[in-house]
Amino acid sequence: MNAIAIGMIIFAYLCGSVSNAILICRLARLPDPRTSGSGNPGATNVLRLGGKLAAAGVMVFDVLKGMIPVWIGYGLGLPPFWLGLVAIAACLGHIYPIFFHFRGGKGVATALGAIAPIGYDLSGLMIGTWLLTALLSGYSSLGAIVSALIAPFYVWWFKPQFTFPVAMLSCLVLLRHHDNIQRLWHGQESRIWHRRQKDRDIDRQQSKH
């Protein structure tokens, strides 16, 4: 069991290390998300850079690279503790990708994918929490933070045996959002639609001249 679990942890890290945001931006001829916008290679930044379809692709593939390793581990009968380590490995790969000089994203979509095999009802609650918070506040990061804080309680309600590994995953996501928390506290965080609205205003001004 330990050999299989360790193998799955390595596999999960390598899956997580495939930075979909960087690859998709290259294919779509969008700016490098690591050096443009917020500097975060994730779906929200890709959306800010002007690619709705590209952002959707990033989101889907980021979810899958967290979901697939955990799903395989779940099918192999790994206990909750080891499944938690597999999930964390996938997120660590996304955050510190070995294939992209260890400069990765925040791990939110990958964490969501890693939680999905526990149950679709839980996944629905997580997505709903993120969407509701993000739409009401305009801050994608706040949606991620609130979802990470609530996730262990959701899991405890539905499948308590997975509470500890999900709590570890939530801690990782919250640590990655330390800078966002600081900016939110000081009122300096960018809203989801702020950059796109600014670009539209510039386009309107240019069209008048």
Curated annotation (Swiss-Prot):
<feature type="transmembrane region" description="Helical">
    <location>
        <begin position="4"/>
        <end position="24"/>
    </location>
</feature>
<comment type="function">
    <text>Catalyzes the transfer of an acyl group from acyl-phosphate (acyl-PO(4)) to glycerol-3-phosphate (G3P) to form lysophosphatidic acid (LPA). This enzyme utilizes acyl-phosphate as fatty acyl donor, but not acyl-CoA or acyl-ACP.</text>
</comment>
<feature type="transmembrane region" description="Helical">
    <location>
        <begin position="112"/>
        <end position="132"/>
    </location>
</feature>
<dbReference type="GO" id="GO:0008654">
    <property type="term" value="P:phospholipid biosynthetic process"/>
</dbReference>
<comment type="pathway">
    <text>Lipid metabolism; phospholipid metabolism.</text>
</comment>
<dbReference type="GO" id="GO:0005886">
    <property type="term" value="C:plasma membrane"/>
</dbReference>
<keyword id="KW-0444">Lipid biosynthesis</keyword>
<dbReference type="InterPro" id="IPR003811">
    <property type="entry name" value="G3P_acylTferase_PlsY"/>
</dbReference>
<feature type="transmembrane region" description="Helical">
    <location>
        <begin position="80"/>
        <end position="102"/>
    </location>
</feature>
<feature type="transmembrane region" description="Helical">
    <location>
        <begin position="53"/>
        <end position="75"/>
    </location>
</feature>
<comment type="subunit">
    <text>Probably interacts with PlsX.</text>
</comment>
<keyword id="KW-1208">Phospholipid metabolism</keyword>
<comment type="similarity">
    <text>Belongs to the PlsY family.</text>
</comment>
<keyword id="KW-1003">Cell membrane</keyword>
<keyword id="KW-0443">Lipid metabolism</keyword>
<keyword id="KW-1133">Transmembrane helix</keyword>
<keyword id="KW-0997">Cell inner membrane</keyword>
<feature type="transmembrane region" description="Helical">
    <location>
        <begin position="138"/>
        <end position="158"/>
    </location>
</feature>
<dbReference type="Pfam" id="PF02660">
    <property type="entry name" value="G3P_acyltransf"/>
</dbReference>
<keyword id="KW-0594">Phospholipid biosynthesis</keyword>
<protein>
    <recommendedName>
        <fullName>Glycerol-3-phosphate acyltransferase</fullName>
        <ecNumber>2.3.1.275</ecNumber>
    </recommendedName>
</protein>
<dbReference type="GO" id="GO:0043772">
    <property type="term" value="F:acyl-phosphate glycerol-3-phosphate acyltransferase activity"/>
</dbReference>
<keyword id="KW-0808">Transferase</keyword>
<keyword id="KW-0812">Transmembrane</keyword>
<keyword id="KW-0472">Membrane</keyword>
